[in-house]
């Protein structure tokens, strides 16, 4: 029996809560399963019947555009029934607890919950209390994790670079407040990337981040040298409890990705960004819209990856 709360007694994926602690075999299975779904998204009839009759509830307690929309599209392309809970109009606004909300929705014969919440651990809490036939996907919880974003990033990297084992990857920006960065680091190291770098000012790095197996840089010129993949992160101003930077202009001067800084990486380096982008803060428009950017393909691949996660969970 597995001690991982994401796995069932047979070692199959029961919930997707974080990339941390998941074996490479499960991560690779998700990436492999996503491959044929890319073709589905390119067809005239963008639908397969794998989740016909299943009810998927999207519970987004934080604002979202890409994640919520791509989860909804992914579920509908799998032929599931999708219910988007309007949090502002729900009983949550009247003081109902998170678990009471989930228990009531479970009584409506939900099959899967996709959850985004400002509190770290919210998806784990739900997973601990739902029936064994219900699956939970963490769509982002506080500063903790965003596993499907990391997985679609891994899918994008593999599509462009084929092999994880010879890559030098740099994650640049607000590492301290980023759930994406944590999920990316766990996925990259699990999949065998030999060198993962984080580049940020000291005020935007977690304490003892080196324990995650990353190399820390405070200087873009050194950190970007010979890098294959650049993963840019926005400043999470909504999670900052105090001022950590003199100004966004100063941040862009030292840490914004410009064509000049990108030239320090390998000539065929690719640039990723989970969105939303703040042009002129963490990335220059010339780079964001340039030939080395794979930011829009990330969004497209996100649908296929989320289809893969849902279909695997439904099959477990």
From Swiss-Prot:
GO CC terms in record: cytosol
Entry annotated with the keyword Glycoprotein: no
Disulfide bonds: none
Pathway: Pyrimidine metabolism; UMP biosynthesis via de novo pathway; (S)-dihydroorotate from bicarbonate: step 2/3
Catalytic activity of the protein: carbamoyl phosphate + L-aspartate = N-carbamoyl-L-aspartate + phosphate + H(+)
Annotated organism of origin: Nitrosospira multiformis (strain ATCC 25196 / NCIMB 11849 / C 71)
Record PROSITE patterns: CARBAMOYLTRANSFERASE
Annotated carbamoyl phosphate binding sites: 66-67, 116, 146, 149, 275-276
Record-given protein name: Aspartate carbamoyltransferase catalytic subunit
Assembly with partners or alone: Heterododecamer (2C3:3R2) of six catalytic PyrB chains organized as two trimers (C3), and six regulatory PyrI chains organized as three dimers (R2).
Enzyme's top EC category: transferase
Pfam family membership, one: OTCace_N
Keyword list, A-Z: Pyrimidine biosynthesis, Transferase
Family: Belongs to the aspartate/ornithine carbamoyltransferase superfamily. ATCase family.
